[in-house]
Amino acid sequence: MLYGAIEAGGTKFVCAIGDEEMTIKERVSFPTTTPEETMPLVIDFFKQYQADLAGIGIGSFGPIDIHRDSATYGYITSTPKLAWQNFDFISTMKKEFPIPISWTTDVNAAAYGEYVFGSGKGLSSVVYYTIGTGVGGGALQEGRFIEGFSHPEMGHMLVVPHPKDDFAGSCPFHGNCLEGMAAGPAIENRLGKKGQEVAEDDPYWEIEASYIAQCAYNTTLMFSPDVIIFGGGVMKQRHMLQNVHDAFAKLVNGYVETPELSKYIVTPALEDNAGTLGCLALAREAVLHS
């Protein structure tokens, strides 16, 4: 028995096959161009394994419709990627693969991967953020995603501008939300160079850490999770995690007694495999509950 994973990202689709032990057997990627160009490549990849394919887990860029009783369940909805607006992802896959399919956001899939296999393994409540080209967040409680009328958009929480930061924010909707102030494009728009080109001792990192710490602070007060995981390219800066710990401690100011910060605010144990493994695990769950 095999399981399929689709990480549908804004720049590329990552497709993988895993076995019953959740070992990745093959993984490929395709550019995210248009449904007409990208989806045939995705379908052809899984066709090779169709005889043994039991279920597929999809984690997609969004916004997406997650309500099973909705007429547009399984759609990518109001995405800024015009070619993908109102694309019926689930039906497109179901036509070729009439098997159980799990459907969630790309960041939820990564959160689930960390919950099952990574930094959240064995814990009851996990919140995961990715800080890269954009900022997204997903939360789990006892293995269930925390969501209501839609999936959370945690990356767009408002943050208080740092006193040394006069940048107005790059989010076209909210300006100084977390994504607008801390995502990769915000760094580049502010400094004129990409985050990986900024020196480790540049004073800017104090500003960046303050926004990520505000995110952790807000998350702590709202959910008090067992762990907060920060992934994405920005968090690959070697010094960033300690900077966030320091800024977070100042914000909390002793008001909440959190777990030890080295175990409470962490980076992904699965690194770049979180999304793929999360999709595989969600595919397995879809089969078990079908």
Spans of features found by a protein language model:
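ATP-binding/phosphotransfer module of carbohydrate and carboxylate kinases, centering on a glycine-rich
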Residues: 1-56, 64-72, 91-101, 116-125, ...
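Conserved A3 ("GATE") glycine/threonine-rich loop of ANL adenylate-forming enzymes
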Residues: 12, 109, 133-136
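Residue-level structural signal for beta-strand termini and adjacent loop
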Residues: 29-30, 82, 150-151
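Conserved NAD(P)H cofactor-binding loop of Rossmann-fold oxidoreductase domains
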Residues: 61
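A charged helix-plus-loop insertion that forms the helical arch/lid used to bind
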Residues: 70-85
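Short alpha-helix plus adjacent loop in nuclease-associated cores
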Residues: 92, 110-111
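Short loop/edge segments at beta-strand edges and connector loops
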Residues: 103-107
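Glycine-rich phosphate-binding loop of actin/hexokinase-like ATP-binding domains
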Residues: 121-177
